[in-house]
From Swiss-Prot:
It is found in: Secreted. Belongs to the three-finger toxin family. Long-chain subfamily. Type II alpha-neurotoxin sub-subfamily. Keywords: Acetylcholine receptor inhibiting toxin, Disulfide bond, Ion channel impairing toxin, Neurotoxin, Postsynaptic neurotoxin, Secreted, Toxin. Expressed by the venom gland. The lineage of its organism: Eukaryota, Metazoa, Chordata, Craniata, Vertebrata. This is Long neurotoxin 3. GO terms for cellular component: extracellular region. CDD domains: TFP_snake_toxin. Pfam families: Toxin_cobra-type.
Length: 73
């Protein structure tokens, strides 16, 4: 599987056994100004995340691109 991976946000081949791509997003103090924080990576399983953290898992090549947000102003 090939997944987008941060910080470079480029598609990379995942290590053996990690066949899922996931996009994890969450807010910090500057969320309303800068938008959500984003982590893109490979995984063996879709992780369980704490409250207020969003995660999307998928299993096809390059299926988890960097999310786009509406302009916040």
């Amino acid at each position: 599987t090939k997944c987008y991976v941060t910080p470079d946000v480029k598609s990379e081949t995942c290590p053996a056994g990690q066949d899922l791509c996931y996009t994890e997003t969450w807010c910090v103090a500057w969320c309303t100004v800068r938008g959500k924080r984003v982590s893109l990576t490979c995984a063996a399983i879709c992780p369980i995340v704490p409250p207020k953290v969003s995660i999307k898992c998928c299993s096809t090549d390059a299926c988890g691109p960097f999310p786009t947000w509406p302009n916040v102003r």
